């Protein structure tokens, strides 16, 4: 595809070349006169070649009016804007939007009355989220501090009460506790805070124990504070350190992070100074071995200090340590452009050697002494850290710092038994320790097969009985089967069978072979294992039996081969719906089974709650299209309850839109009206169940296109492609209206209000849709104002609805809606006047209007609060009370 795009760009360039040179037949003198202009044009062509191919296609689409309109017709641009962004919480806004920082920057710079940042909690979430140390983040914090400080020159009155410089201590404390070096550094520079002030904050607000449980972030901020001389003497990283070595020294860490962690740790303390202090306090006895280890550590630190990060390639730095040691990452020198993959020895070449080699243009004369073995470097890092902890932790805590199994696997050549003794038995190993040990040993390609056989035999013979408990056998079984090594599995099964033959059946210790194979079939990751079971253990297990349910466990990548093996002996798979809807892959399996009725038998007898959770869980996993495919082809025994469609509060409510469009594609407002009329007739007898009964809809669907090849489809007897099917579902009136709202069918909602006011405006339907708890979560300022205008124009029975909408507008801070009401020439401003005996044209009493203002104060939108206080005819005492509330929050 890339080549095709490049060809197209070259063709475009060639076309331009021909256009520029179309006067080649002119006289030579004319050519010379045009030569500067030709050169200028050719220079433009060269810059054009630097454009990414995808950008060419973007502009082709962007300039095509028809395609452009079609794409942007899916965006509700007039409905959503800054006025609909309320607060910047960490989950839904900061991490839920890829451009959240840009939105905040734009909102601040726009001097808009509607500020997204509403309170200190929003700022704390920002500090917790944006920590990257780059120019963009630094500029962002400078802008933030400038905007929210007492010296701000913004012409707009801030709706928020935040003033960074009015409580310097509190914000320093928050930035340290959120380990945000970037924000703290910019904060100190912006407000020109001296080191003594920071020390004072540390002494009062940050306990020395804060650095006791050390993470990478805490090491980073500790060293930063130390570098600017802002650490009080009471705050020492050591001996309070209690680092989680399992995380800190994990071989799954990226190499570059591991190097940084090492440097942060070593830089955080002066070993010699600490040793001298401990000697003075009599805490450290000078023993020859201690001195030897201390000298060894210093020597390793010196050696590692000579190694520069620039000597490693980007591939190496971005790889995990485990991958580097397993030789699965391409490695290359830091200067040469060629990359070579190694399988025996990982090396880097010193920059000095590279420099000399490049100057001499001779890559064959590299001094072998200048080559550094990467494995040795990694080993030095680990040994240095282990020695470091030996000298810095309290004696009573030294027992928790043990070397991990992977350290012995990669850096020490020891027997399996000896490694078990070191990393498991010595520490009275937990189930997790056993799990890690067995899986690592059995999957390690560098350990001889005979040693693995011996391990299996020792476990089955209870050689590890000291720490190996009965239920730990299942951990071992899983480790064997997850190895996906046919030789190991075969050896294990034969030994199990042999042990069972020598035992009394009633007290057999281990499960049957057939049960073991089925219990762990979800671990099979290659066809050869399936073939092995099929050829050798087919009669001893249920894996390939007729109507077996093991298809639920087989990995999707292998399911086709499993179907082939099962079908080759005339058997079918069975897929029961009950209890399996929570499996992440169940919907994919279900769709596959529906399309292959000759291979699967399916029972759709699950309850409505089963189907609800199936849809719920898969919407959360971005599988809207799979759900649609399922609904298009499934044969339900009863209408499906889809009340989940009305979910407005779930974090994935927006993902439901695709499904809602699919279901309501051919359901007109007239058909909805007919259904509601039937519901309305049922309400006359005031029966609760009937009044709140669900509405049943029928939508027309087309069976999904089969994903299998035509030949395979013919073999398994797939459903007819393109066949029209009917699908019945039920929803409540509330959910119906929420769905119409989400589909931008607000006109249809108003149509239904007009046609069936008795349905929506009766007291027992007062909780439907327009209640504050429901409309609050989904309404934009644009549509909320539409509803307000509609209720104003139809005041017969809509006063309650109108009031709820005004409360929502106030709480969300939609200032413009109230400005429009106040400036309206349609005499709607009376809505914001107090109803009295002499003024019956108003709708709301003093308490109701007071509550509207209270909501704006609670949301910290003081501009709106002051607007309403000044306009509503409160008493002088009432105005003063509301203004005092504002002052208390400022």
Swiss-Prot record:
Name of the molecule in the record: UPF0746 protein DDB_G0280811
Disordered: region residues: 1-39
InterPro entries xref list: UPF0746_actin_org (IPR051904)
UniProt record similarity statement: Belongs to the UPF0746 family.
Compositional bias ranges of the Basic and acidic residues kind: 1-35
Top-level taxon of the source organism: Eukaryota
Biological classification of the source: Eukaryota, Amoebozoa, Evosea, Eumycetozoa, Dictyostelia
């Amino acid at each position: 595809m890339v080549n095709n795009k490049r060809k197209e760009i070259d063709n475009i360039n060639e076309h331009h070349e021909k256009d520029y040179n179309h006067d080649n037949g002119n006289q030579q003198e004319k050519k010379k006169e045009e030569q500067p202009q030709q050169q200028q044009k050719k220079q433009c062509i060269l810059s054009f070649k630097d454009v990414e191919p995808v950008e060419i296609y973007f502009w082709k689409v962007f300039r095509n009016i028809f395609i452009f309109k079609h794409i942007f017709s899916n965006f509700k641009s007039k409905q959503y804007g800054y006025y609909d962004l309320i607060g910047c919480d960490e989950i839904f806004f900061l991490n839920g939007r890829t451009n959240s920082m840009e939105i905040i920057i734009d909102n601040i710079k726009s001097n808009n009355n509607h500020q997204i940042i509403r309170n200190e909690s929003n700022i704390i979430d920002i500090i917790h989220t944006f920590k990257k140390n780059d120019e963009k983040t630094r500029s962002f914090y400078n802008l933030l501090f400038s905007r929210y400080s007492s010296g701000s020159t913004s012409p707009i009155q801030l709706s928020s009460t935040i003033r960074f410089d009015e409580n310097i201590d509190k914000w320093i404390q928050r930035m340290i506790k959120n380990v945000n070096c970037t924000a703290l550094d910019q904060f100190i520079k912006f407000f020109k805070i001296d080191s003594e002030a920071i020390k004072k904050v540390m002494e009062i607000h940050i306990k020395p124990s804060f650095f006791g449980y050390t993470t990478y972030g805490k090491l980073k901020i500790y060293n930063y504070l130390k570098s600017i001389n802002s650490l009080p003497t009471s705050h020492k990283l050591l001996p309070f350190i209690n680092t989680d070595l399992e995380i800190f020294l994990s071989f799954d860490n990226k190499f570059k992070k591991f190097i940084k962690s090492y440097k942060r740790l070593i830089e955080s303390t002066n070993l010699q100074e600490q040793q001298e202090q401990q000697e003075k306090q009599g805490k450290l006895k000078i023993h020859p071995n201690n001195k030897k280890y201390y000298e060894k550590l210093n020597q390793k630190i010196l050696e590692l200090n000579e190694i520069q990060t620039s000597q490693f390639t980007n591939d190496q730095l971005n790889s995990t340590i485990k991958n580097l040691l397993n030789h699965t990452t391409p490695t290359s020198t830091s200067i040469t452009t060629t990359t070579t993959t190694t399988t025996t020895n990982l090396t880097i070449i010193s920059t000095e050697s590279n420099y000399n080699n490049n100057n001499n243009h001779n890559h064959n004369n590299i001094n072998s002494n200048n080559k550094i073995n990467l494995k040795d470097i990694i080993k030095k890092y680990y040994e240095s850290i282990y020695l470091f902890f030996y000298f810095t932790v309290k004696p009573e805590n030294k027992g928790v710092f043990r070397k991990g199994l992977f350290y012995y696997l990669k850096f020490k050549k020891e027997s399996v038994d000896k490694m078990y003794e070191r990393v498991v038995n010595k520490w009275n190993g937990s189930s997790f320790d056993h799990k890690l040990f067995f899986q690592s040993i059995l999957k390690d390609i560098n350990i001889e097969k005979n040693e693995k056989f011996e391990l299996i035999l020792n476990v089955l013979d209870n050689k590890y009985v000291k720490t190996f408990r009965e239920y730990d056998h299942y951990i071992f079984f899983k480790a064997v089967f997850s190895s996906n090594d046919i030789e190991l599995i075969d050896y294990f099964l034969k030994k199990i069978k042999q042990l069972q033959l020598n035992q009394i059946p009633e007290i057999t210790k281990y499960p049957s072979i057939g049960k073991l194979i089925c219990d762990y079939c979800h671990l099979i990751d290659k066809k050869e294992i399936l073939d092995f079971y099929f050829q050798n253990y087919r009669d001893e297990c249920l894996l390939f039996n007729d109507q077996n349910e093991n298809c639920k466990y087989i990995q999707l990548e292998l399911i086709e081969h499993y179907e082939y093996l099962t079908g080759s002996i005339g058997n079918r798979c069975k897929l029961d719906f009950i209890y399996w809807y929570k499996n992440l892959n169940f919907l994919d399996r279900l769709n596959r089974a529906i399309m292959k009725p000759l291979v699967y038998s399916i029972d759709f007898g699950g309850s409505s709650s089963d189907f609800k959770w199936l849809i719920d869980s898969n919407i959360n996993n971005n599988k809207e299209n799979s759900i649609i495919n399922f609904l298009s082809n499934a044969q339900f025994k009863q209408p499906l309850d889809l009340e989940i469609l009305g979910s407005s509060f779930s974090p994935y409510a927006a993902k439901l839109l695709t499904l809602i469009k699919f279901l309501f594609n051919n359901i007109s407002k007239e058909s909805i009206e007919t259904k509601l009329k039937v519901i309305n007739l049922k309400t006359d007898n005031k029966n609760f169940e009937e009044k709140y009964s669900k509405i049943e809809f029928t939508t027309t669907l087309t069976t999904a296109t089969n994903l299998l090849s035509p030949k395979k489809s013919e073999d398994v007897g797939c459903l007819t492609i393109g066949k029209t099917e009917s699908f019945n579902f039920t929803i409540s009136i509330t959910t119906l209206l929420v769905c119409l709202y989400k589909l931008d069918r607000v006109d249809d909602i108003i149509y239904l209000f007009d046609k069936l006011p008795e349905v929506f405006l009766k007291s027992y339907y007062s909780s439907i849709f327009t209640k504050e708890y429901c409309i609050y979560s989904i309404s934009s300022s644009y549509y909320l104002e539409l509803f307000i205008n509609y209720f104003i124009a139809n005041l017969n029975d809509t006063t309650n609805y109108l009031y709820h909408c005004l409360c929502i507008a106030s709480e969300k801070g939609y200032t413009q809606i109230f400005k429009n009401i106040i400036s309206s020439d349609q005499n709607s401003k009376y809505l914001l006047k107090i109803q009295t005996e002499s003024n019956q044209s108003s709708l709301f009493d003093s308490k109701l209007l007071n509550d509207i203002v209270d909501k704006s104060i609670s949301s910290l939108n003081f501009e709106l609060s002051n607007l309403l206080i000044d306009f509503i005819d409160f008493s002088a005492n009432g105005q003063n009370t509301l203004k005092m509330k504002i002052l208390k929050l400022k």
